[in-house]
């Protein structure tokens, strides 16, 4: 299988996430084709360049792609390419599915850590790094239908679903 990766190489956070993704993909025997964008004006052409070459598109949390969600989703959906973004907001914008960071939960975790510091219960240098437990998949059923994809019931029963 081949997966397309779309990102703004000028965003250090995006490039970092892509490197991690490429290593994970290689470990699973998945080929990665990259397409980079520097503005929302590049998104349509980048998706088109990957069309017919990839089984799906993955992209990290990226400001350019977030700003161009509607363009990205339309281009990929028109080409019948499943999209898996790193941010759940893009699912609401028309991308297919993700398992992403829950920013509300992350904020609560950070707030608890900050309170512990302010109350003198912990010192930042002594605190363990915290991560979220795995989240539920978030799936846009309207997008699945638009690209001709049927999501298996065993996945749907454990997912949060958007139907618009």
Identify the role of each PLM range.
Residues 1-164:
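Short hydrophobic alpha-helices and adjacent helix-cap/hinge residues
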């Amino acid at each position: 299988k081949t997966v397309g990766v779309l990102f703004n190489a000028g965003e250090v956070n995006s490039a970092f996430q892509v490197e991690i993704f490429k290593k994970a993909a290689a470990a699973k025997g998945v080929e990665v084709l990259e397409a980079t964008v520097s503005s929302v004006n590049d998104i349509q052409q980048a998706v088109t360049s990957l069309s017919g070459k990839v089984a799906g598109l993955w992209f990290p949390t990226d400001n350019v792609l977030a700003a161009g969600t509607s363009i990205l989703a339309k281009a990929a959906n028109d080409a019948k390419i499943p999209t898996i973004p790193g941010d759940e907001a893009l699912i609401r914008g028309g991308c297919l599915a993700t398992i992403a960071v829950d920013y509300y939960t992350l904020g609560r975790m950070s707030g608890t850590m900050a309170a512990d510091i302010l109350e003198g219960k912990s010192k930042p240098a002594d605190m363990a790094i915290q991560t979220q437990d795995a989240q539920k998949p978030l799936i846009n059923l309207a997008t699945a239908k638009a690209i001709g994809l049927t999501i298996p019931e065993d996945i749907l029963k454990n997912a949060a679903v958007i139907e618009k």
